[in-house]
Design a protein with these regions (language model features):
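Elongated alpha-helical scaffolds
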Residues: 110-114
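Compact, glycine/acidic-enriched structural inserts
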Residues: 75-98, 118-148
Length: 194
């Protein structure tokens, strides 16, 4: 029996972060604790809007506050100043918070797959449909740091079939297909892939 889940937490800190951010501020209100909800057996989720979670991925938020980019690691409940590879561009609106997963690809390349938008210019995106949040995220994709990329999000049923058939390939092991909900950071498992 495996007692500890394998994650990339240590590598995440080394790659994405510099110094801890210990001062108080607006960022403390943006502690996102992502939750993966179990499969809802009563409802078919094949037409749900979602993406995949990588095996061993580490949840991260990347946010712009004044002139700083902060990285929040929910597994450690800690904020850090972003490393140069993760810094958001000056064009990124202040008080904008992105949600993604830190993964290490098969060739040992670290990256952040950003798949949701939590806040834009301080306005909460809670209760906004996932498709609308993703459309806004796509428009802001050019403001992400070099290690970040906008993750593909679409119909879960199609994604699950394509992953299982091998027609849709990603450079890391996929744990599951998940549906985004109206709350950023809350995803429902549609099907396990690993």
């Amino acid at each position: 029996m495996e007692l500890l889940r394998k994650t990339h937490a240590h590598a995440c800190v080394l790659v994405l972060c510099t110094d801890p951010c210990l001062h108080p501020g607006d960022h403390l209100k943006d502690r996102i604790q992502p939750k993966t909800l179990p499969i809802d057996s009563g409802k078919p989720q094949s037409d749900a809007f979602g993406t995949w979670l990588a095996l061993g991925a580490e949840w991260v938020t990347i946010a712009k506050y004044d002139d700083s980019t902060l990285v929040y690691l929910p597994s450690q409940d800690s904020f850090y100043y972003a490393s140069p590879a993760c810094v958001l561009s000056p064009e990124c609106p202040k008080r904008t918070v992105f949600l993604g997963q830190f993964v290490i690809d098969s060739d040992s390349t670290p990256r952040v797959l950003v798949h949701d938008l939590v806040r834009l210019q301080g306005a909460s995106f809670a209760d906004m449909p996932a498709r609308e949040r993703y459309a806004c995220l796509q428009q802001l994709g050019g403001t992400l740091g070099g290690i970040c990329t906008v993750q593909w999000v679409g119909e879960c049923g199609v994604l699950g079939k394509e992953l299982k058939s091998g027609r849709f390939k990603v450079p890391h092991t996929v744990q599951s297909v998940v549906a985004l909900t109206t709350v950023p950071g809350r995803v429902k498992v549609v099907e396990g892939v690993h």
